[in-house]
Amino acid sequence: MHSLDEPLDLKLSITKLRAAREKRERTLGVVRPRALHRELGLVDDSPTPGSPGSPPSGFLLNSKFPEKVEGRFSAAPLVDLSLSPPSGLDSPNGSSSLSPERQGNGDLPPVPSASDFQPLRYLDGVPSSFQFFLPLGSGGALHLPASSFLTPPKDKCLSPDLPLPKQLVCRWAKCNQLFELLQDLVDHVNDYHVKPEKDAGYCCHWEGCARHGRGFNARYKMLIHIRTHTNEKPHRCPTCSKSFSRLENLKIHNRSHTGEKPYVCPYEGCNKRYSNSSDRFKHTRTHYVDKPYYCKMPGCHKRYTDPSSLRKHIKAHGHFVSHEQQELLQLRPPPKPPLPAPDGGPYVSGAQIIIPNPAALFGGPGLPGLPLPLAPGPLDLSALACGNGGGSGGGGGMGPGLPGPVLPLNLAKNPLLPSPFGAGGLGLPVVSLLAGAAGGKAEGEKGRGSVPTRALGMEGHKTPLERTESSCSRPSPDGLPLLPGTVLDLSTGVNSAASSPEALAPGWVVIPPGSVLLKPAVVN
């Protein structure tokens, strides 16, 4: 007896198949419909209407035990699964494929005639293919392994409507001949199309050719070029079976198997060797003093000897500059850096805040609302003050031309920044933009309370010159601290020393930590 754990043999007789089913039912019991669903790989348990092409009940696999079944399935006896449809479909008189002895034993009803199989539709439209249905709603269904339904592979035939591969069609101008073999196409192009033209040499008229009619001065060059269109690769590696269109590429490839490296670096003291000249040329760029490939992002001064290194830098840091931005950079060059101090000191009586480039400040290269380039040079804030800042003459120790005590900076009225780069445009939360020093002593008390405590801890690490400058910047008893020379500690947050933004002095702008860089500079 055949085992049902093996793939189903469609040549089993009715008696053997029924005996195997009865023996399995005695040992395993009745298989539930959901178990049969899982065995057949059916996920959806929702009721589905019967297929219009399903065969009548006599053609279904089912147990002989009656059971109440839904209207979508009907009880049907076991039938012979053969490799061909029932003979009643082919014979004109509707004769059955089952013997009279099997019909007379009472187990099997008479097989339906050919007229009952009219709505039956076969797979792929081929009448010789077998199609059967399993009653999923019956209780005593036959347990079939999933491997039983694996059909043998069939030869795939392409539809005549599908287009032929492009390499088998001659795309030469006014020539669309079809070929079955690639060699036939290559011979056709080489014999009929590769011909010299008057005053032009060997020109390629293949559809979509990038040369656009520019000819070759030799026939062998034309034949090599044609291989880019026909995809011909006649040179094959005997070791790994890779094919190449040019013999030189095959020779270079063979060196990967032999380990030969004939190209040596020409620089003295460098004995690196390479298998091809292009890799050696890339290596020789590392010995150049000049680095012609540089980053075009404002504020970035990276330069490289190899273009691939520049591409890696641009991809890693997001320094993508469009053509429009490059034109603006050429029209508006970045300002020159400030001159160094004549006495070698860090600064005289001012401070500068360097605003980073747009990519570092906003986190992305594409800023449609921001005019580029943003000047990468330092922004001098030492001379910025509110409107009525030219107070009393307490300006001892200041540089010439600077106002007296410089009041809190008002970045919203900054004349050095264009209008889109106000305090709100830079994404800086504006606490107060009040002009003047109308706050009085009470607001001065708040201003003194907003000084971070970390700034006091930094006094022990300062140089003597920094201690002198910080001593001059202590807040006066009547109002706000005097600038320039004030030590600003931006490393702490807004609420580090004050519980609310109201503790800040009027006119000050809260700058997030890490957004700006304080740098000593010279005020001319």
UniProtKB/Swiss-Prot annotation:
Changes after translation: C-terminus cleavage is induced by interaction with CTNND1 and enhanced by Src tyrosine kinase.
Keywords, ordered alphabetically: Activator, Ciliopathy, Cytoplasm, Developmental protein, Differentiation, DNA-binding, Metal-binding, Nephronophthisis, Neurogenesis, Nucleus, Repeat, Repressor, Transcription, Transcription regulation, Zinc, Zinc-finger
GO molecular function, one term: transcription cis-regulatory region binding
Gene from which this protein is expressed: GLIS2
Entry note about domains: The C2H2-type zinc finger 1 has a major repressor function and is required for CTNNB1 binding.
Chief location of this protein within or outside the cell: nucleus
Tissue expr: Expressed at high levels in kidney and at low levels in heart, lung and placenta. Expressed in colon.
Organism, scientific name: Homo sapiens
Region ranges (Interaction with CTNND1): 35-174
Family per similarity comment: Belongs to the GLI C2H2-type zinc-finger protein family.
Subunit structure: Interacts with CTBP1 and HDAC3. Interacts with CTNNB1. Interacts with SUFU. Interacts with CTNND1.
Function: Can act either as a transcriptional repressor or as a transcriptional activator, depending on the cell context. Acts as a repressor of the Hedgehog signaling pathway. Represses the Hedgehog-dependent expression of Wnt4. Necessary to maintain the differentiated epithelial phenotype in renal cells through the inhibition of SNAI1, which itself induces the epithelial-to-mesenchymal transition. Represses transcriptional activation mediated by CTNNB1 in the Wnt signaling pathway. May act by recruiting the corepressors CTBP1 and HDAC3. May be involved in neuron differentiation.
Biased composition (Low complexity): 84-100
Region of interest called Transcription repression, as start-end residue ranges on this chain: 148-171
Compartment(s) where it occurs, according to its Swiss-Prot or TrEMBL record: Nucleus speckle; Cytoplasm
GO biological process: cell differentiation involved in kidney development; central nervous system development; hematopoietic stem cell homeostasis; negative regulation of DNA-templated transcription; negative regulation of smoothened signaling pathway; negative regulation of transcription by RNA polymerase II; positive regulation of DNA-templated transcription; positive regulation of protein localization to nucleus
Region span, Transcription activation: 71-137
Keyword hit for Cell cycle: no
Stated name of the protein: Zinc finger protein GLIS2
Zinc finger (C2H2-type): 168-193, 202-229, 235-257, 263-287, 293-317
InterPro entries named among the record's database cross-references: GLI-like, Znf-C2H2_ZIC1-5/GLI1-3-like, Znf_C2H2_sf, Znf_C2H2_type
PANTHER family found in the cross-reference section: GLIS FAMILY ZINC FINGER 2, TRANSCRIPTIONAL ACTIVATOR CUBITUS INTERRUPTUS
